[in-house]
C-alpha cells in the first residue's frame, strides 16, 4: 500500500496557478484581492451593440422600465396587498369606460381620414409625383399616430403600404360608382365616411353606394331598421348576400337539369305505358298526374309570388302598425331625397340593374359605366364578384393584401366592374377583442383568448350557447346574480369536455376550444347583429328571443302530454361530420395481439403446450402497404 497523502500535500503552487487561470477565464473575480479598481465609465462602451429588440412587454415590465428611465425609486409596501381574482382577467370595459370611449369616438371621428392623392396634371413628372405622394402619406401616418397617442384611442390595423393606396386612388379616379362592401352584422365598423368625402372631392358626378353583404343573417325588421337609418343619413344602401345568391343560382341550375331529366323520363314512361297498358288504365292515372303537376305549379307560383312581392305588401299580424308607419314615412323620405333604400335582398340581375341605373351624370368613358368595388378582405368582396360572374374570376382570401393590383372585369358591353385590392382602413374600436370577433384580426394568430371569449359570452345568451353546442354550462352560485352571463372559463370548460379537447394533464384545452367558438362567431353560427345608434342592442336580437321561445314551447308540450320531457338537441356541423362518417374505425396505441400471438411469445391460449416451433413471426405482415400510422397523423384534420 502506498503512503496516504495528507490534506496539505495535494495543494501546491502549481495547482494554485492553474486554478487562478481557470477562474480568470470563467470571469471569476476574487473579493479578497489587494488590487483596488474603480469604474469611471469614461471609455467607449463596446457592449452597447449587444441590444435586444423589445416589441411587447408585460404590464409589470413596462412599468419597471418606465420607472427606470424616469429615475424613480420605489419602496416595497408589504401591508398593502390586493388579491386580483381570475374573473378580473375578462378584458372587457365597464359601462362607464365604454360610454367615455364612445364619446371620444364621436368627438374625433372627423380626424379619421384616408390619405389623399396630391393634385397633379399632365406636366407633373413621375419623380415629383412619387415624392409628393410619399410626403403626404408620411404626414397622414404621423397624424394618426398623434391621434392614437394623445387621445389614448385604439385604431384598427390599417394598410401601411403606399402602393395599395395608389391602387385605391386609381380605382376612384376611373370609377363612376364607388361601392363600399361592408358586413351587415356591423356596418358602421367597416364603413369609412371619409372615403365618401374623398370620392366627392375627386368629382361631384361620382356616386357613392353601400353594399351590405351577408344580409341573409339579418331578419326583415333588422334590415328595415338599417335601411331607415341610412335613409336619414342620406346614404344609398343595398342589401345583398353573395353566398345565398350563389346557392340559389346553383339550385336553379340543378332544378333545370332535374326538370329536363324528368321530362325525358316522363316521355319514356308514357310511350312504355301506351304499349303495355290499356286505355282505361291510362285514363285512371292521368287525373292523379295532372293533380300532382297542378299542385307543383301552384307551389312554384306561390313561392315566386312570395319572393317577388313588393315590400309594401309584406305584412303579418304583429307588423301591421309598423308597416303603416313605414308606409307613411315613405313619401317624406322620397320627397327629401332622390332615392329610397329598400330592405329587400337583391338578386344578381337586380343588383346589376341597380349599378346601371344609379348613375345618371357624365361618365369617365362614353357609353360605359365603371363600378369600383372597395372593401375589407373579410366582408365578401371577392365572393360578390365571383357570384356575379358565376365562376371564380378573383381568388378568395382573408389575408389583407392578397390582391396586388386592381383589375377591370366586363360583365356586359356597357357595364365594367373594377376590383380594388382589399384595404383595411383606419377606424375606432374599443378593445382588441372586438377586432378579433369582427374578423379583422386572424383567429389563428390570437395570443390571448380570454377577452374575445368574454365578449362572446356577453353578446350571446346562455341558452343559445347551450342549445347550439348541446352543452350544460355551470349555473351561478347562490350568492351571485342568477341572470349573469357565463364566464369564459365556464363556457370553454363545458365545450372542451363535450368535444374531448383535452390537454396532456387531463384538463380541457381552453385555447383550442376558444378558436372553434370564435370561428363559429365570425362565420355567423353564433349570430349577433349590431344595431343602429340609439337602439337598444338587447331589443335588436329577435333570433335570441325566438330561440328561447322555441325551447320553452317544447318544454310545455312535453309537460302537458305527461310524457317524460326530452332534451331538445340541435344538430350542428360538428355533430354531422362526426356521426355521419363514411368510414368509422377504432384507433389504438401500443403493441396489440395479432392472431392470438404476442411478439416474442407463442399463442396466448392457456392449457396448450407450445410443442411446435412456429416458422417465422406470424404476427409480422411483410409487404403490407396499409401499415399502422400514428394516431395524431390520422386525426390531423381535427386539429384547430
Swiss-Prot record:
Keyword Acetylation among record annotations: no
Pfam families the UniProt entry points to = MMR_HSR1
Cite the record's Acidic residues compositional bias ranges.
253-270, 290-304, 320-331
Report domain CP-type G positions: 165-426
Give the Polar residues compositional bias ranges.
Answer: 332-341
Task: Alphabetically list the UniProt keywords.
Answer: Cytoplasm, Endoplasmic reticulum, GTP-binding, Hydrolase, Nucleotide-binding, Nucleus, Protein transport, Transport
Where GTP is bound, by residue?
Answer: 213-216, 375-382, 419-422
Q: Which InterPro entries match?
A: G_CP_dom, GNL1-like, GTP-bd, GTP-bd_ortho_bundle_sf, P-loop_NTPase
List every stretch annotated Disordered: 251-341, 602-640
Cysteines joined through disulfide linkages: none
The record's GO molecular-function terms, alphabetically, read: GTP binding; GTPase activity
What are the Basic residues biased-composition ranges? 618-640
Family recorded in the similarity comment: Belongs to the TRAFAC class YlqF/YawG GTPase family. LSG1 subfamily.
State what this protein does.
Answer: Functions as a GTPase. May act by mediating the release of NMD3 from the 60S ribosomal subunit after export into the cytoplasm during the 60S ribosomal subunit maturation.
Q: Per its record, how is this protein called by name?
A: Large subunit GTPase 1 homolog
Which species is this UniProt entry from? Answer: Danio rerio
